[in-house]
């Protein structure tokens, strides 16, 4: 038969299918398993009458299908024991809270980033870090305020008064807009509070990735930026490393990212050593006068099959060279620290574009034929460089018309040499035009 058991202490209801021949003693044992109440503490009532007689079957006690049995507690000793258990549980909970608060205090003391964040967000609590008892009292006080509703998302009396006035005239569009704005701000504050609790590290600054690199034997610190299209070096650092004489001024142009900066040229190949490795690998640089002396961009990361292993905090180059990313304290001049001015055109930019009818750094597609640019050939006159470049459509049309004539300027062997690298004849001729007939420079342009 089916019986419904209702626990009067917590209003819990349980429906069970049991046999009519089950004794009351077995029924009480079943209830103990379901409700965790011992048979001695059980008070069972059916139709307002207590059930008694542990050896009697439920059928003999008058229980029928779909009857209701009320379960209550009658033992005073049980109540006392329960109270004692409650006190013990509260004591254990208190000890657990104390342990968590002390662990949090220790974490704040051992983690400089969290310590700095606490100093900015809650100076009063930060001042108690070195005093465990004061810190505990402050945290408990904050928790009590939070439980009482004094959360960042709750309304202060002034806001509550304003909300009441707005609700007095709910049909006014301005009032509705203001109420929606207050609700939206409350949700934002709640979301921010949630982020504080589950991901406090998101409110601290993230260290940028720097590595040690030897350029022409000179040890420098390079900023690793997988979002930058090209590897960049400043003229000052190029001079310091003794490679400024290798700057090819024919690659003058403009780098466009968040802003724009002048490209002073390109260094085609310089041996560099990553970290403490003695293995040298070739590296090319775009020369830009920027606040980042050396930026290790995506072109070299791809070329040397680099892996940014953030779990181990290392840069893996070519599968066999590893170097640790520098700690913030090891970075000699960090331009990304607050208050350090710098250009926005280098780090994180999309690379540069060369001029005239030129091509974009990092691409060899046909669409580059339409890119407006400002390459200044070495033998150009000042008047020539001041002429305005035609628009993209005109450039493309002129180039298509002059392709046949341009091919006669260059030897067929030079064109075939570039075509054998996987490029079309038009791209090969176009690159030769930009490099003034220099096959090596043209190949470098096509591979960018």
Swiss-Prot record:
Biased composition (Polar residues): 146-167, 378-388
Database matches in InterPro entries: DDI1_N, Peptidase_aspartic_DDI1-type, Peptidase_aspartic_dom_sf, UBA, UBA-like_sf, Ubiquitin-like_dom, Ubiquitin-like_domsf
Active site: 225
PROSITE patterns: UBA, UBIQUITIN_2
Principal location class: cytoplasm
CDD domains in the cross-refs: RP_DDI, UBA_scDdi1_like, Ubl_Ddi1_like
Class of enzymatic activity (EC top level): hydrolase
Intracellular or extracellular location(s): Cytoplasm
GO molecular function, one term: ubiquitin binding
Its EC number(s): 3.4.23.-
A Gene Ontology biological process term: protein transport to vacuole involved in ubiquitin-dependent protein catabolic process via the multivesicular body sorting pathway
Domain Ubiquitin-like, first and last residues per copy: 1-78
Keyword set, alphabetical order: Aspartyl protease, Cytoplasm, Hydrolase, Protease, Protein transport, Transport
Span of domain UBA: 409-448
Region (Disordered): 146-175, 378-411
Pfam families: Asp_protease, UBA, ubiquitin
Keyword presence, Disulfide bond: no
Any Gene Ontology CC annotation: plasma membrane
Superkingdom of origin: Eukaryota
Complex formation: Binds ubiquitin and polyubiquitinated proteins.
Family: Belongs to the DDI1 family.
Role of this protein: Probable aspartic protease. May be involved in the regulation of exocytosis. Acts as a linker between the 19S proteasome and polyubiquitinated proteins via UBA domain interactions with ubiquitin for their subsequent degradation. Required for S-phase checkpoint control.
Protein's recorded name: DNA damage-inducible protein 1
């Amino acid at each position: 038969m089916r019986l419904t058991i209702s626990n009067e202490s917590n209003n819990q209801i349980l429906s069970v299918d049991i046999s009519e021949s089950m004794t009351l003693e077995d029924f009480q044992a079943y209830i103990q398993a379901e409700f965790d109440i011992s048979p001695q503490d059980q008070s069972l009532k059916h139709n307002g009458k207590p059930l008694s007689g542990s050896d009697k079957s439920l059928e003999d006690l008058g229980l029928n299908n779909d009857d209701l049995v009320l379960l209550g507690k009658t033992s005073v000793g049980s109540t006392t024991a329960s109270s004692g258990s409650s006190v013990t549980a509260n004591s254990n909970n208190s000890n657990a809270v104390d342990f968590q608060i002390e662990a949090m205090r220790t974490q704040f003391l051992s983690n400089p980033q969290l310590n700095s964040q606490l100093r900015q967000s809650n100076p009063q609590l930060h001042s108690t870090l070195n005093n465990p008892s004061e810190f505990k009292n402050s945290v408990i006080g904050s928790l009590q305020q939070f439980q009482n509703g004094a959360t960042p998302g709750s309304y202060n009396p002034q806001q509550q008064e304003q909300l009441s006035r707005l609700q007095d005239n709910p049909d006014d569009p301005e009032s509705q807009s203001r109420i929606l704005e207050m609700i939206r701000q409350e949700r934002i504050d709640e979301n921010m509070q949630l982020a504080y609790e589950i991901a406090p590290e998101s409110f601290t600054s993230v260290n940028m990735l720097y590595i040690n690199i030897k350029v022409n034997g000179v040890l420098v610190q390079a900023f690793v930026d997988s979002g930058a299209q090209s590897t960049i070096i400043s003229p000052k650092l190029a001079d310091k490393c003794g490679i400024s004489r290798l700057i090819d001024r024919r690659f003058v142009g403009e780098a466009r990212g968040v802003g724009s900066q002048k490209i002073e040229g390109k260094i085609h190949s310089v041996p560099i050593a990553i970290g403490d490795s003695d293995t040298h690998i070739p590296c090319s640089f775009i020369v830009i006068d920027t606040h980042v002396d050396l930026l290790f961009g995506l072109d070299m990361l791809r070329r040397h099959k680099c892996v940014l292993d953030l779990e181990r905090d290392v840069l893996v180059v070519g599968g066999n060279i590893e170097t640790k990313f520098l700690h913030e304290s090891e970075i000699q001049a960090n331009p990304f620290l607050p208050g350090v001015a710098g250009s926005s055109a280098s780090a994180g930019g999309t690379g540069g574009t060369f001029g005239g009818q030129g091509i974009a750094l990092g691409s060899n597609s046909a669409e580059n034929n339409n890119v407006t640019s400002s390459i200044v050939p070495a033998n150009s006159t000042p008047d020539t460089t001041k002429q305005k470049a035609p628009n993209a459509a005109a450039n493309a049309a002129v180039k298509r018309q002059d392709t046949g004539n341009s091919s006669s300027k260059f030897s067929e062997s030079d064109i075939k040499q570039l075509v054998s690298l996987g490029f079309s004849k038009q791209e090969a001729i176009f690159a030769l035009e930009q490099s003034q007939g220099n096959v090596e420079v043209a190949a470098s342009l096509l591979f960018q």
